Amino acid sequence: MKVQQYRLDELAHLVKGELIGEGSLQFSNLASLENAEVNHLTFVNGEKHLDQAKVSRAGAYIVTAALKEHLPEKDNFIIVDNPYLAFAILTHVFDKKISSTGIESTARIHPSAVISETAYIGHYVVIGENCVVGDNTVIQSHTKLDDNVEVGKDCFIDSYVTITGSSKLRDRVRIHSSTVIGGEGFGFAPYQGKWHRIAQLGSVLIGNDVRIGSNCSIDRGALDNTILEDGVIIDNLVQIAHNVHIGSNTAIAAKCGIAGSTKIGKNCILAGACGVAGHLSIADNVTLTGMSMVTKNISEAGTYSSGTGLFENNHWKKTIVRLRQLADVPLTQITKRLDHIQAQIESLESTFNLRK
């Protein structure tokens, strides 16, 4: 199969960059500085990568004007303000897209479902009653859409995804393999030593330009809906419980868990393995560092941490012993000791005239 080639001047135009060098050069792909060959385009995202750039074999470089001055031995450049953003834009040029349309013969689709003529429905897909699939949407093999599910335009639903609970997806949503959208929320009423299941009557609403990774679970609401606003991005292995509301452009990394009825604001970042307790509210523009555990509301923007960083093993054991000892001492006793030490320091300063 012939590999698609793109001219350097065409690529520069796509990112609104300034071309320096030979615009007719042909490129077959993007590549890292380390592994690029003469038919590859690469990018330099900061001065710390200049040493690699100087020895790279790439045919052309996406750089800022300032970085170009450090590469006099190179000939071909696309000059932009943000090389990383330009790289992100060009990945879509070289990405291998699915161009098929139509419905595979092994798919099973309810007669009441409305499927766009420009959509693609893969092998063994099951689509239930009153479902809607929009223009140019791709649904890969073995995926299931239960009754009353709606999927908008230009979406990509990977293999083995289940969308249930009358969930509604807007446009340009991407969902990767083995994720479940709209599954039953974890709701039970305790009574006389037993758990009594609560039927989950809500749904899941997903906005435009949302990306959800593989093996995620996003549960439908008990009464109100679980909501992901526009631009939310979610890594693999994330659990979002019923009635959660996630604000626009929030990013959630792998292995995070968000308990029910919590509201997370806009433009937040949850790094890997964060946990958020239920019925909480997190303000806009909050960043949680890795392994943080949120147990109370966060009302102000900022960066918050509670995860413990790595220690050498013996150091860790000593630290834990000290923490346990500290926990055994009443806070009032610690305060009295600190007050006593402070009084002694002030007395010494006064005696020896140490204060300035």
Swiss-Prot record:
SUPFAM superfamilies listed in its UniProt record: Trimeric LpxA-like enzymes
Name the record gives this protein: UDP-3-O-acylglucosamine N-acyltransferase
List of catalytic residues: 242
One MF annotation (Gene Ontology) recorded for this entry: N-acyltransferase activity
Assigned EC number: 2.3.1.191
Pathway: Bacterial outer membrane biogenesis; LPS lipid A biosynthesis
Family (UniProt): Belongs to the transferase hexapeptide repeat family. LpxD subfamily.
HAMAP family noted in UniProt: LpxD
